[in-house]
């Protein structure tokens, strides 16, 4: 696995200086170093800005609806400030046994999520939203990936969590 760049301090939308039209044309609406790493592989100039949105799951919302809504809201939140730029928003979650799994945030929750996923089929749903400044339209694409986890024992899960620290990854 390629090592990630050191964590960057990504400004939130409220911490930004006034709009500068000489900046890049593409804005990544995300605080994720993983998404910045992926977009950086395309060797495009872009600016990364953390959107400030409520990421709570709405009642009755499916995993696919949830990630599509968040990707769209992230793109639109940043596009309000930068309406003349292409804005890319994205989100991902996993679903196991009908439960939406977000970022665990803590080691014990990461272990719990992976224990629940052991031997199960898990769907990772990734949504990408692109705001087009010419039309003010947001296009959203969804890619579900189905993974069948082999049975994992507790010590293997703990080793993985302690080594990889997947606390900011949906479903650990």
Language model feature labels by segment:
Residues 1-10:
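Extreme N-terminal basic, low-complexity initiation segments
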Residues 9-22:
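Short, Lys/Arg-enriched N-terminal segments with co-localized hydrophobic residues
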Residues 23-44:
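N-terminal beta1-alpha1 ligand-phosphate binding loop
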Residues 24-27, 63-172:
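Anionic-ligand binding patches
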Residues 31, 51, 133:
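Cofactor-binding loop segments of dinucleotide-utilizing enzymes, especially the Rossmann-like FAD-
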Residues 47-55:
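A short beta-strand-loop structural module common to alpha/beta enzyme folds
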